[in-house]
From Swiss-Prot:
Enzyme class name: transferase
Native source organism of the sequence: Streptococcus pyogenes serotype M6 (strain ATCC BAA-946 / MGAS10394)
Protein name: Tagatose-6-phosphate kinase
Pfam families tied to this protein: PfkB
Family: Belongs to the carbohydrate kinase PfkB family. LacC subfamily.
Entry EC no(s): 2.7.1.144
Gene Ontology biological process terms from the UniProt entry: D-tagatose 6-phosphate catabolic process; lactose catabolic process via tagatose-6-phosphate
Gene name linked to the record: lacC
Keyword set includes Protein biosynthesis: no
Length: 309
């Protein structure tokens, strides 16, 4: 079983407009509301793929109830209730653009943070892999993912971390290491303080930096150019075919789902990398974020090329 953790989920609201007019009323006919957050995208894709998955995180208020009520019944909902209201994130789609208004989310108390920590420990009993995705809510210290990873490691669970900024830096500088991290080139550049390119030799060199010691897998997204990955002392380049992209939103989360599935099923390197990239591409072919159409899985799987470099 796979446990997905979304500590700061949201209701994602989409407002499509022909034109966004400022300082006046804009009326919307077709409003879409869905449970949002990177970890929730991961769990929906895992569910589409047929994995047994349970979802946790911190939710509160009517918005939190909305999230629970709008997840598929086959996903085991194990969220931790807090006093604050779960946030709302608004995307205004207008004239080929997307303008976003993102709430910060609730402020968690020390007691609520401690309560979730105990809740997390309890949820580990029957899981093999844990995914940790997205930003931390207000009130949680930067090293909180480091704490959860330490707990998972003590219980023999594999972890996939997909975050950035201070939270990622705290994990890399801490004692407890995740099984997998999945930065993109921009995040890698921020971590290392220098501009990173798709040059293989340069990527090989930086992924052997002491900053990444103890991390079994480092999987770097190269966008349409596929993936560059390091597993222990072996490096891989993953080439992907060109596809018609409907929406790339959530494709990174779908890739995380594939990584988690590969770990949970003890798949070899090539199978894990292939599955992860296929699920990412399948999501990009869908209008709905965090969804894959498995009818196209086998065809795409055969088109992925994984080579050792």
């Amino acid at each position: 079983m796979i446990l997905t953790v979304t500590l700061n989920p949201a209701i994602d609201v989409s407002y499509p407009l022909d034109e966004l007019k400022c300082d006046t009323v804009n009326r919307v006919v077709d409003v879409t509301k869905t449970p949002g957050g990177k970890g929730l995208n991961v769990c929906r894709v895992l569910n589409d793929f047929g994995e047994t998955v349970k979802a946790t995180g911190c939710i509160g208020g009517e918005s939190g109830d909305f999230i629970i009520n709008h997840l598929p019944d086959s996903i085991l909902s194990r969220f931790y209730k807090i006093s604050g209201d779960t946030r709302t994130c608004i995307a205004i789609l207008h004239e080929g653009n997307q303008t976003e208004i993102l709430e910060k989310g609730p402020l968690l108390s020390v007691n609520e943070i401690d309560g979730f920590t105990h809740h997390f420990k309890y949820l580990l009993n029957d899981v093999d892999v844990v995914t940790l995705s997205d930003s931390l809510p207000a009130g949680m210290p930067d090293d909180y993912y480091q704490k959860l990873i330490g707990i998972a490691n003590l219980n023999g669970k594999k972890t996939v971390l997909d975050c950035s900024g201070n939270a990622l830096e705290a994990v890399l500088k801490g004692d407890s290491k995740p099984t997998v991290i999945k930065p993109n080139l921009e995040e890698l550049s921020q971590l290392l303080g220098k501009e990173m390119t798709k040059d293989f030799d340069a990527l090989k060199e930086v992924l052997q930096d002491k900053l990444f010691d103890g991390i079994e897998w480092i999987i770097v997204s190269l966008g349409a150019d596929g993936v560059f990955a390091k597993h222990k002392d072996t490096f891989y380049k993953v080439d992907i075919p060109k596809i018609k992209i409907v929406s790339a939103v959530g494709s990174g989360d779908s890739t995380v789902a594939g990584i988690a599935s590969g770990l949970a099923n003890d798949e070899d390197d090539r199978a894990l990398l292939t599955k992860a990239n296929v699920l990412g591409m399948l999501n990009a072919q869908e209008k709905t974020t965090g969804h894959v159409n498995m009818a196209n899985y086998d065809k795409l799987y055969q088109s992925i090329k994984v080579k050792e470099v």
